[in-house]
């Protein structure tokens, strides 16, 4: 498994200093509906500490920073690519190659 990022994301990481990407599963459990979805976002130092120490997320070092992954099994393609998305000036991370 190889983690890559697009040049736009790499430039944003260098400019902003946000070099930790968090991959977490968000679950909505309602009486009529159950939804599980991956949520990928930047994590600050405090959030990183919470997810590594308390939630036992594993850390993968990459050439562009760290990726925090949950302990439960996810399906990874051979190459996982992270890219930058910008909507109305708000930056977020997209992923390709990770499935629940």
Predicted regions and their residues:
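Domain-level signature for proteins that mediate thiol-based redox and metal-cofactor handling
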Residues: 1-29, 33-100
């Amino acid at each position: 498994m190889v983690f890559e990022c697009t040049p736009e994301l790499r430039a944003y990481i260098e400019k902003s200093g946000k070099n930790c990407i968090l991959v977490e599963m968000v679950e909505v459990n309602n009486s009529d509906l159950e939804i599980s979805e991956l949520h990928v976002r930047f994590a600050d130092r405090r959030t990183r500490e919470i997810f590594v120490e308390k939630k036992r997320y594993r850390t993968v070092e990459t050439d562009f920073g760290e990726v925090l992954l949950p302990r439960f099994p996810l399906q990874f393609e051979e190459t996982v690519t992270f890219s930058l998305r910008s909507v109305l000036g708000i930056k977020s991370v997209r992923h390709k190659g990770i499935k629940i």
